[in-house]
C-alpha cells in the first residue's frame, strides 16, 4: 500500500529545549593521523563481549579482524592501524568494568588488509544482516546497538517505513550534521540499498530544523530524479527539541505511530537507522573495509580548537585532544558522548570506542555541580518525560529500594535521557537514582 509523507512532524510528549552549542557545525571534518598505539576493548557494543583471535606478536593490517564472538548479539572488532599486536590485557572501561583489550603498536604505514574485499552481492535480508555484522557495524548514533539485528527483520514483521535519523538532538554533537553535508550522496546510496532489500517504499530523512544547510543539501539530493526516480525519499524537518533523536520519540514524530512499551520500531512497521550507519553500509558494500574509523565531535570550553575529527578507533582521548590543539585549561569534566546521555570519565587515557560520537572537555564553570534541594512536587519532570513516566516517584522509590513499586511505575521504560533532571528546579539527581533503581530491579530478577 502506498504510504503518504507527513507535511509536518507529529506531536510527541515531553522533551526539553536544551542549549544547542553546535559550535563545530560549520567546520570541515579533519582526518587524524594514526597514533603510535591503539587499545581495542572487547566490549564496544550492546551484547556479548568479543574474544581475541590474535596473539602477541601477530602482524595486523587496517581492517584485520582481531576479535569476534559466537554469540548472536555481538559484532567483530577490526584493527584501525597496521602494525603488531603488543599484548592482550585488562583495561578499565568508561563504566568502570574491567575487560580484555587488544593493544596494537602502529607501524605508521596504514596498510589495508589484502583480504579485504567487497562483500558478495547482497539480495536478501539475511545477507544484509550478515554483511552488517561482518563489517563490525554498531549504531553510530551513540547507543552501540547491533545494527545487523535491526536489519534482520523477523518474517512476521513488515517494514513499510525507513527513518534515517539525523535529529542529533544532543548539545555540542555535530558529527551527523557533517556527515549529511560531506557524504550526502553516499547516504542516499545506502538508503537505496536498504530500501531495495527490505522492500521499503517510504523513506523519511528526519532532521532537526537547527541544521538548515544540511536540510538543503539532503533535500537537493533526495529531489534529484537521478537519485530518487520514484520519489520515495523525503526530508522531514523536525522541531529542535531534546530527545527528538531517541528511537521511540522519532518514530512518533515522523509517522504518528507509538511504539509499545517494551516493543521495537519494527512492531509498528518502522526501521530507524542513524545517518552515519547508513552511509557506512554504502561504503562497506562498495569497498569491503570494515568499521575502523569514527567521526567524533571534539568540543567544550577546555578544548583549544573544537572540530569534527575522523579518528582511528582505539585512539586515546588524550591524543585526540592534542590533535585539536590541546586543552585551554585543566579540564574539570571529560565526557564521552553528549552532555545529556554521555558518560563522564576520570581520565583521558581511555580509548575512543565505536559508538563514541563526541568527546567533551569542560572547565570549572561548566563542570560545577549544583547542590540538590528538596523536591517541591512541581510536576516539571512529569511534563518533560517523553515516556510518560513519573520521575519524582521513581526517584523516591529507588532511594527506598522498593522494587515492587519501581516495577509498577514501569522504571525499565525510562531511557535515561535526562529531561527530568534538566527541568528540575530543585536540581534533584533523578537520573542517577533511576539508574540505581534499575539495578535493584535487575538484581531482584536475577534471584528468581
Q: Predicted segment positions?
A:
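Hydrophobic alpha-helical positions that pack around
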Residues: 200-317, 323-328
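Ferredoxin-type iron-sulfur electron-transfer modules in oxidoreductases and energy-metabolism complexes
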Residues: 356-372, 382, 386-448
Amino acid at each position: 500500500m502506498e504510504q503518504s509523507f507527513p507535511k509536518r512532524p507529529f506531536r510527541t510528549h515531553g522533551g526539553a529545549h536544551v542549549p544547542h552549542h553546535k559550535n563545530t557545525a560549520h567546520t570541515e571534518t579533519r582526518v587524524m593521523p594514526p597514533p603510535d598505539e591503539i587499545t581495542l576493548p572487547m566490549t564496544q557494543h550492546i551484547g556479548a563481549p568479543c574474544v581475541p583471535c590474535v596473539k602477541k606478536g601477530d602482524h595486523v593490517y587496517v581492517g584485520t579482524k582481531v576479535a569476534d564472538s559466537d554469540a548472536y548479539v555481538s559484532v567483530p572488532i577490526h584493527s584501525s592501524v597496521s602494525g603488531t599486536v603488543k599484548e592482550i590485557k585488562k583495561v578499565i572501561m568508561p563504566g568502570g568494568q574491567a575487560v580484555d583489550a587488544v593493544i596494537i603498536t602502529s607501524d605508521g604505514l596504514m596498510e589495508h588488509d589484502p583480504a579485504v574485499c567487497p562483500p558478495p552481492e547482497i539480495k536478501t535480508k539475511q545477507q544484509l544482516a550478515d554483511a552488517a555484522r561482518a563489517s563490525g557495524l554498531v549504531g553510530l548514533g551513540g547507543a552501540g546497538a547491533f545494527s545487523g539485528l535491526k536489519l534482520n527483520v523477523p518474517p512476521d514483521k513488515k517494514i513499510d517505513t525507513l527513518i534515517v535519523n539525523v535529529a542529533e538532538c544532543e548539545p555540542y554533537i555535530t558529527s551527523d550534521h557533517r556527515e549529511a553535508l560531506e557524504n550526502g550522496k553516499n547516504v542516499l546510496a545506502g538508503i537505496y540499498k536498504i530500501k531495495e532489500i527490505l522492500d521499503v517504499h517510504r523513506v523519511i530523512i528526519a532532521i532537526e530544523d537547527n541544521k538548515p544547510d544540511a536540510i538543503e543539501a539532503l533535500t537537493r539530493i533526495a529531489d534529484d530524479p537521478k537519485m530518487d526516480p520514484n520519489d520515495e525519499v523525503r526530508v522531514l524537518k523536525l522541531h529542535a527539541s531534546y530527545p527528538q533523536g531517541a528511537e521511540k520519540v522519532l518514530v512518533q514524530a515522523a509517522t504518528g505511530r507509538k511504539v509499545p512499551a517494551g516493543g521495537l520500531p519494527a512492531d509498528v512497521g518502522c526501521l530507524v537507522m542513524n545517518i552515519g550507519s547508513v552511509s557506512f553500509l554504502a561504503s562497506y558494500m562498495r569497498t569491503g573495509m570494515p568499521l575502523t574509523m569514527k567521526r567524533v565531535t571534539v568540543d567544550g570550553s577546555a578544548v583549544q580548537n573544537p572540530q569534527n575529527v575522523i579518528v582511528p578507533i582505539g585512539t586515546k582521548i588524550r591524543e585526540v585532544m592534542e590533535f585539536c590543539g590541546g586543552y585551554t585549561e585543566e579540564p574539570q569534566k571529560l565526557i564521552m558522548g553528549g552532555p545529556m546521555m554521555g558518560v563522564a570519565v576520570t581520565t583521558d587515557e581511555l580509548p575512543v570506542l565505536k559508538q563514541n560520537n563526541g568527546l567533551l572537555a569542560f572547565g570549572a564553570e561548566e563542570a560545577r555541580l549544583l547542590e540538590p534541594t528538596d523536591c517541591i512536587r512541581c510536576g516539571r519532570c512529569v511534563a518533560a518525560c517523553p515516556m510518560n513516566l513519573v520521575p519524582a516517584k521513581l526517584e523516591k522509590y529507588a532511594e527506598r529500594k522498593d522494587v515492587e513499586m519501581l516495577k509498577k511505575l514501569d522504571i525499565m521504560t525510562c531511557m535515561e535521557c535526562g529531561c527530568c533532571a534538566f527541568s528540575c528546579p530543585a536540581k534533584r539527581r533523578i537520573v542517577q537514582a533511576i539508574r540505581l533503581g534499575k539495578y535493584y530491579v535487575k538484581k531482584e530478577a536475577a534471584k528468581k
